[in-house]
Each structure stands twice: as structure tokens, then as C-alpha cells.
From Swiss-Prot:
It comes from Aspergillus kawachii (strain NBRC 4308) (White koji mold). Pathway: Glycan metabolism; L-arabinan degradation. One of its GO terms (cellular component) is extracellular region. Residues 1-17 form the signal peptide. Keywords: Carbohydrate metabolism, Disulfide bond, Glycoprotein, Glycosidase, Hydrolase, Polysaccharide degradation, Secreted, Signal, Xylan degradation. Pfam families: AbfB, ArabFuran-catal. Optimum temperature is 55 degrees Celsius. Belongs to the glycosyl hydrolase 54 family. The active site is at 221 (nucleophile), 297 (proton donor). GO terms for biological process: arabinan catabolic process; arabinose metabolic process; L-arabinose metabolic process; pectin catabolic process; xylan catabolic process. The record marks 176-177 as: Cis-peptide bond. This is Alpha-L-arabinofuranosidase B. Residues 18-335 are annotated as: Catalytic. Disulfide bonds join 21-31, 81-86, 176-177, 401-439.
Amino acid sequence: MFSRRNLLALGLAATVSAGPCDIYEAGDTPCVAAHSTTRALYSSFSGALYQLQRGSDDTTTTISPLTAGGIADASAQDTFCANTTCLITIIYDQSGNGNHLTQAPPGGFDGPDTDGYDNLASAIGAPVTLNGQKAYGVFMSPGTGYRNNEATGTATGDEAEGMYAVLDGTHYNDACCFDYGNAETSSTDTGAGHMEAIYLGNSTTWGYGAGDGPWIMVDMENNLFSGADEGYNSGDPSISYRFVTAAVKGGADKWAIRGANAASGSLSTYYSGARPDYSGYNPMSKEGAIILGIGGDNSNGAQGTFYEGVMTSGYPSDDTENSVQENIVAAKYVVGSLVSGPSFTSGEVVSLRVTTPGYTTRYIAHTDTTVNTQVVDDDSSTTLKEEASWTVVTGLANSQCFSFESVDTPGSYIRHYNFELLLNANDGTKQFHEDATFCPQAALNGEGTSLRSWSYPTRYFRHYENVLYAASNGGVQTFDSKTSFNNDVSFEIETAFAS
């Protein structure tokens, strides 16, 4: 006699390269929303995965799989975005329900962009390969969010649903709330039980699990649950995987959290049982909107990286989810390269020269804690030469990228704070390390390098009125002006004035 799982596997064997949503369909819990910038989630899907907008002329284009059911056409993105910046403006729904994710509007909390909207994600912050083919995930800095408040077919009230997401288990924080899933249609907090979304992070304000985090939890509104009880649940382990599969499902008086390494192995069940015994959570009052990277009320202080995810109609069986996990592992997610162009070498000492016409005698330097540009040459004072010289070290937050230590103030590094570049002493915190890590890429104007913030990949080293900022190509800050952006973010790497 065949088990349900064996029957499911036999049924799928007749389907060439069945995708996650084919597997859910075979398990009688079809996808009602399917989002990914890396690959098709149905074997037959060949439509648009996501939309890009480039900074040079605000033109948009869509990126589709190379073949039906295949990997995203990263080369089309690279060509479209060459010598400029690109944002991900839409993440398309592959299910046919039109549940596309777009820039999240203001709600209980305003976002940092124009009119209170959240920021859009850089198109190049999360490069990966799937089975050796290049693709890009969605690297979401604090303030970034996507949403659909008019979704079709998603669970409402106490209806059953399932969901999974493939996330970066090393990119997180303790702010509210890096979510993917079901939320309020008003972008406001309408009470306990009005959400059911995957959360990844190390917040301990509501629930938390074993160790120091991060944890997969469920955001049910007004609480993050790691198990049956509010607060601590020992069965929810800390996550250490670079690529994480997070799976959540909920129905009438039942719900579950499951998780796994998305690169190998099988799903583990961290909780499966009755709804929390607190007011508002049984029955649930789900509203059916879809969020990514934010809380239901547009809380937008969290960070994380999203590669793919779906929401289903009905409560998926463990066997169905196990088969989806096998499919994810078979996709072979591997970290891609964050750097391009002229290379830095850890341990070398450099000076960085401005390339903007009319300013090419100026170098990145500092005056006390202010990072600025100053005119420097061989006749300058020893003090100024040292202030304009930087020791390159392996990135404090990411070993692919780099941090820049002051020659004249050892132990102090260039970091961004409120998007100004400052010279501050390394305090050893995760926040400082992320603020002080920058990824070089081929200069946007073709001269040298452009230095992109690892933690805010829409933002680059930019000189503006002779002061250095972490600036975006267009934005709400004065120093985000598009005028001369490519020149202002491009620097020649030269032999240091001092060492």
C-alpha cells in the first residue's frame, strides 16, 4: 500500500520539474499567491516575475524566467541596469490571481519615502545562483516594504491557509516586523488574530524561542508566537542557516511552525497544535491582505531578505510541505557575488579620489568625525595626508565586502548614521558592523569604483557639497538628488598619501 506522500510523489513524477505550486496543487491546497524574483514556482510559468525601474530615466521593464518553470533572466536585469541603479517596483503573483506586491502605503506607521510610502528594494542587494544560474533576491533594509491590500482568494476569518518563504537566516534584526503573509486590509492594527504571517528575526518583545535567535515565529497581530504560549517557547530553535525555509499554516483551532535549511535536509516541526489560548486568536479574524518585509500596521523597522514564497488555500499536509522542501533543496540556492569592478585587497592602504568634473583634486578625508572631501596633493601636510588615507579591511558585516579604517585614527571606521558618513570607533555591535560595511562595484560613471552600502544597497558613498553621505539615486533627502549622481558616487582608487 502506498502512503499519501508516495502517491503524491508518483503523481508528480508525470510532471516535468514540478514547481512548489504544482506540488501544493497536487496536495489539494493550491497556491493563491506565489512570489519570487529568483525563479518560476509553477513548471509552466513563463510570465513576468518582477518589474524594475532604473534611476537614469525612470524607465521600467519586467524580468521573466529564462524558460518556462525556470530561473529568472538575471542577464536581462544586468543589461537594463548597466551604469545606473535599479529598484524592484513590483513582485508579480504567479498564481493568476493578480496578487502582485507593490510599494507599501502608509498605515499605522508612515514609511520613509514620499507621502509616507515605504522604500523600494535595490535590485542588486541579494545576488544568488540557483543550480549555477545567477538570480537576485529582495534585500530589504529597514523602511522597505511591499503590500497588496486587495488580494483575491486569500484566507479570511478562520479559513485555513498555508505559506512558506525562503529567506536569508543571517539578515535580520529585532525590530518589528519582517513578515510575509496574511495581514490587515487597512494597513492598521485592527486587533488580535487579524494576521497570520511568517516572521523571521530576533525580537523578544512578544514571543521568542531557544537561544539568541533569530527565530521563525508567526505574527498573529499584537503578538509574535513561537509556540502555544505568549513569550518563551523552548521548542522554537534559533536559526543559523544562510538560506532558510520557513513554513507556517493555520486553520480552525490549529496552526504550525516548521523550518529547515533551504539548501539541504528536511523540514522540522517547531510547533503544531491548538491556537493560543488568549483573547482574539481562536477563532481567528484574518483579513487577507498580503505583506512583505513589514508588520500589518506598516511597522517598518525590520530587515531581511526574501527569495520566494507562496500562500495557499487550505491547510497543507506535512507530506505536501516536505515535497516542497525537497523542491527548494533541489533548486540549489548558493550565495552570489556582491562585488564587481576594480578590486580592493584587505590590508592595503588607499586614497579615494573624486571623479566629478571640477572636483577631481579632492579626496575622501575626514575632519574629526565628519567624512568629507578635501583637496590633497604631495605638498599637503602630513596630517591631511593621513586624514585622506584609509586601510581596507574585510567587511565587518560581510566578508565579500569591505570596511575602511582611518589611518590616523586606528580602530575608527567610515560608517553611515542617518545616512551621513561618519568616522566612529568600532563599538563591536552588529549595528555598527552593518553600518560600516560597503560593497564595491564598477563605477557608475565608468571611472574607478562605486561603494554601495551593504545594509542599504540603494545607497552609495556620495560627495555632496564636499560632505560624504550614503545617498540614493533620487529620494527625499537633499543629498539624494539625481543631478550628477553617477559622477558623485564614482571614485578612483589610488595609492595612499600615507600608510
